[in-house]
UniProtKB/Swiss-Prot annotation:
SS bonds (residue pairs): 50-103, 51-66, 54-99, 56-64, 73-80, 77-92, 82-90
Site (Reactive bond for trypsin): 58-59
Source organism: Pisum sativum (Garden pea)
Name this protein carries in UniProt: Seed trypsin/chymotrypsin inhibitor TI5-72
SMART domains linked to this entry: BowB
Site, as annotated: Reactive bond for chymotrypsin: 84-85
Record-linked SUPFAM superfamilies: Bowman-Birk inhibitor, BBI (SSF57247)
GO cellular component: extracellular region
InterPro entries: Bowman-Birk_prot_inh (IPR035995), Prot_inh_BBI (IPR000877)
Organism ancestry: Eukaryota, Viridiplantae, Streptophyta, Embryophyta, Tracheophyta
Keyword Kinase among UniProt keywords: no
Amino acid sequence: MELMNKKVMMKLALMVFLLSFAANVVNARFDSTSFITQVLSNGDDVKSACCDTCLCTKSDPPTCRCVDVGETCHSACDSCICALSYPPQCQCFDTHKFCYKACHNSEVEEVIKN
């Protein structure tokens, strides 16, 4: 009889554990304030943003995108996508009506047709 009570208690404990785990469901959304994004953050300084290779359409107004690939995106990038590699290869997918100033002395700006 005591063995039967232990089985019932174990089942009850397992059920309570699973219910408590299910009640605290993990939120699978991307949280931009998570620890890892704070560690890898480029900052929010738009004034220091730069881009060596900016592609723009010939539309009026133009739609421009920085296509630099590096270990991080420029500081004003909102949509930075990084490959899972070492070192990381990151590219910004934001579009603007302008290009940021060049990061280096040789400014390269290419214009593509819309």
